Amino acid sequence: MIRRSVLGLGLGIAALLASAGLHAAEPASYFPPPGEWARKAPAELGMDAAALAAAVQYAQGHETERAVDFSDQEATFGSRLGSMPTRRARTNGLVVYKGYVVAEFGDTSFVDPTYSVAKSMLSTVAGVAVREGRIGKLDEAVAKRVNDGGYASPQNAPITWRQHLQQESEWQGSLWGKNADFVGKEQFGAGERKPRTPGAPGSYYEYNDVRINRFALSLLRVFGKPVPEVFQEQVMDVIGASNTWKWVPYNNSYVELNGKQVPSVSGGTRWGGGMWINSWDMARFGYLWLRGGAWNGRQVVPSGYVKEALTPSAHGPDYGYLWWLNTKGKTLPGMPATAFAALGAGSNTILVSPEHDLVIVWRWHGGNVAEFGKRVIAAIR
């Protein structure tokens, strides 16, 4: 009688929870502690080991043609403003499935530039600014909080934080010796562009590192400290990253702050400098975003911001807040619409597929990101 009553009570509670939209808690996600990351054999997680090995073999067979010593840097991007390493790693990467490392190839500990993957890191810093109230609403004008002359003109005054994040700011001017118009072979190399009359902020998408660097400087202003310090304290230390990464400024990208000269960093390595990092720390960063901006119970990036960041903007390609999206199925053909990626020249890639609980880091490759992703996914049984 007692057993039946207890059973009835249990069923009643279960029904009540179900009616309230509540369910039994999912197993807690694994978060790697600093300095280590648990590995599991593919078969332990229901993966086909042979298929995964074949996917990795595909990745290893697609080494980039970029010069190992960066001797092609200026011809490709224009005159340098910052330093570069003497060499880069060969193609390498990691596959993280359900939180565990199931594959590793190449020299994943080598620290070198990750180019425009740094843009997605700037987006993360902006998310921290939102969390801390340093940015009120993303649709407010940057000029409301940043008064350094960069938004004084009629063209630049209306620019919002969201427009910077979506690369639709149409900011005009020069910064660190580079003009936002990208005109000139010497300054911009093979990436030079034809003159174009700028539109109103928010009306046009253009992938533009000068404008992103202006955005990075604006983040420095609202935090009152260099962006790398914020990124280390609020992101990288929280996720247990190593101390080997560094965000290298240009030689001339210093501003006065509280009577001191402090560095402002870039959102890429087009003109040298930028984020220098290894594959393990890139994987931790990707895993943070796979987990919705949370790490082991701590919400590093607001969940609402993450959702917005992975929503496509009105203009241009499938692009969110400095993340490449796949909602139209064109960025990563054949992969889920929910997949997204941080992409940098080289090529350097962090690929995230929430539908498959998957993070892939693939560096210094000349292959098809979606093809590698699909081959890994095909190994999931």
Kindly give the residue locations of the regions a language model identified.
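Bacterial N-terminal signal peptides that target proteins for export
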Residues: 1-10
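Active-site Gly/Thr loop motif
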Residues: 243, 248, 254-269, 310-359
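Catalytic-site signature segments of enzymes, centered on catalytic residues
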Residues: 101-109, 171-251, 273
